[in-house]
Regions:
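S-adenosyl-L-methionine
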Residues: 203-223
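Core catalytic lobe of class I
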Residues: 1-200, 223
Length: 223
């Protein structure tokens, strides 16, 4: 499940967390993951509302900062938070990045699970790196004031789901999560109360489906 901010003003209001979590727990699979985009102070309140399921935080680092009007009074904001919740360990496909091969030799490392010190060799012959909690993706502006970039949503979908899984976005806005699901071969359920944005989302998802079908046809024809 991926939840985007529906509206900047809406998230600034107090949220009825108890009924929200009741529904989320009802519909999520035992090994399902809930990733919620949230700025402060909503983000802190969200985490405190369900410490039992809360696991960790991801940071979306944007390419362009916001809050220019407040730049003389405080640092401009260039990140958003993604809070990750789940009942049991979910599907996890780490999205590795490419780099130069390295061999840092043998090192003593502390196990995060048991706290024991173990001697391990830090080496990568192909230069692959495991992902960190900082995600660098460019902003997208075209359809919604709190629009999330499709590549970022696709990263989350590939990380926490398998091909064919169902992804729910209960605040889908302009449908970026749905577009990412089409691109990544996942099924999608989206909810949006604003008619204007619902129509935008519907159009974008249909266009993505057409593009995927056309691409599949071209690929099949070339074989």
């Amino acid at each position: 499940m991926i939840a985007e901010e529906a509206d900047c003003d809406e998230w600034d209001k107090a949220q009825p967390f108890a009924p929200m979590w009741e529904e989320y727990r009802r519909i999520i699979k035992p090994n399902g993951c809930i990733a919620i985009f949230a700025g402060e102070p909503f983000s802190s309140a969200l985490v405190q509302s369900n410490l039992k399921m809360y696991r960790y935080e991801l940071i979306w680092k944007k390419n362009v900062a916001t809050d220019f009007l407040s730049a003389r009074r405080r640092p401009m904001r260039i990140h958003d938070k993604i809070q990750v919740f789940y009942k049991k360990a979910p599907v996890y496909h780490p999205q590795k990045t490419k780099g130069e091969p390295y061999d840092r030799g043998w090192q003593n490392r502390k196990s995060e699970l048991y706290g024991e010190m173990k001697r391990q060799r830090s080496k990568s012959e192909n230069g692959e790196r495991f992902p960190t909690s900082i995600l660098n993706f460019k902003r997208e502006y075209h359809f919604h004031p709190t629009q999330k970039p499709v590549p970022l949503l696709a990263w989350l979908i590939r990380t926490y789901t398998d091909v064919g899984d169902v992804v729910l976005d209960p605040f889908m806005g302009s449908g970026s999560t749905g577009v990412a699901c089409v691109q990544e071969g996942r099924q999608f359920i989206g909810i949006e109360r604003e008619d204007t944005y619902f129509e935008v989302a519907k159009r974008r998802i249909e266009e993505a489906q057409t593009t995927e079908r056309w691409g599949s046809t071209k690929t099949g024809g070339a074989e």
